[in-house]
């Protein structure tokens, strides 16, 4: 088998997940596969260690092609073998990459707990811890939007004192088990 080297000149060993050498490189249907654009048998040193994706946002990382080589080219063509990925941790099986990098990095808008929110200008801004706590315990309302809580009591009449709003720390302490704050005047 030819000596394979990465872009920094380090040897690349073609092995399976158990460390056994790969003799014949095939896809899931048994067809021989070859990988182009990622591995070469001669070391190529670049000025930059960044990938070509930054320079060409719509370029493909590597393309795989089913075998079209003559039958005796087994060991020689293993130098461009599938199973060696371009740093993504995945192997390809005859599919070409179509579309830009942004399409693959797009995320869904639904999230159960978000640490950022819309800034109103098409971007995102990071929530503060105070905002997260208010959202969790204070139902996420602003101070001017909160409705005062009314308590109905049955039993002996109490003195009519104006009800003070609980601070955020008191609300948190009330939610914690065993830390109920009963120091109300």
Curated annotation (Swiss-Prot):
User: What InterPro entries does the record tag this protein with?
Assistant: Dehydrin, Dehydrin_CS
Q: Name one GO cellular component term.
A: cytosol
Which parts of the sequence are annotated with region: Disordered?
1-185
Superkingdom of origin: Eukaryota
Its Gene Ontology biological processes?
Answer: response to abscisic acid; response to cold; response to water deprivation
- Which residues, by range, are in coiled-coil regions? none
Q: Where is the composition biased (Basic and acidic residues)?
A: 1-10, 44-55, 130-146, 161-177
One MF term in the entry's GO annotations:
metal ion binding
- Enumerate composition-biased segments (Low complexity): 67-94, 147-159
Q: Which family does it belong to?
A: Belongs to the plant dehydrin family.
The name of this protein is Probable dehydrin LEA
Species annotation: Arabidopsis thaliana
Q: Which gene encodes it?
A: LEA
């Amino acid at each position: 088998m030819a000596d394979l080297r990465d872009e920094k000149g380090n040897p690349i060993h073609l092995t399976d997940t158990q460390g056994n050498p790969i003799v014949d490189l095939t896809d899931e249907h048994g067809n021989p596969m070859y990988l182009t654009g990622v591995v070469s048998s001669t070391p190529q040193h670049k000025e930059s260690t960044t990938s070509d994706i930054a320079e060409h946002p719509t370029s493909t990382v590597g393309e795989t092609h089913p075998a079209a080589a003559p039958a005796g080219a087994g060991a020689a063509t293993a130098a461009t073998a599938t199973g060696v990925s371009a740093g993504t941790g995945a192997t390809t099986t005859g599919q070409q990459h179509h579309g830009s990098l942004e399409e693959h990095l797009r995320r869904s808008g639904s999230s159960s707990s978000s640490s950022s929110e819309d800034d109103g200008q098409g971007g995102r801004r990071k929530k503060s811890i105070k905002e997260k706590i208010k959202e969790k315990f204070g139902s996420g309302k602003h101070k001017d939007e909160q409705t005062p809580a009314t308590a109905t009591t049955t039993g002996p009449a109490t003195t009519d004192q104006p009800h003070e709003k609980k601070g955020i720390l008191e609300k948190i302490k009330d939610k914690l088990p065993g830390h109920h704050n009963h120091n109300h005047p």
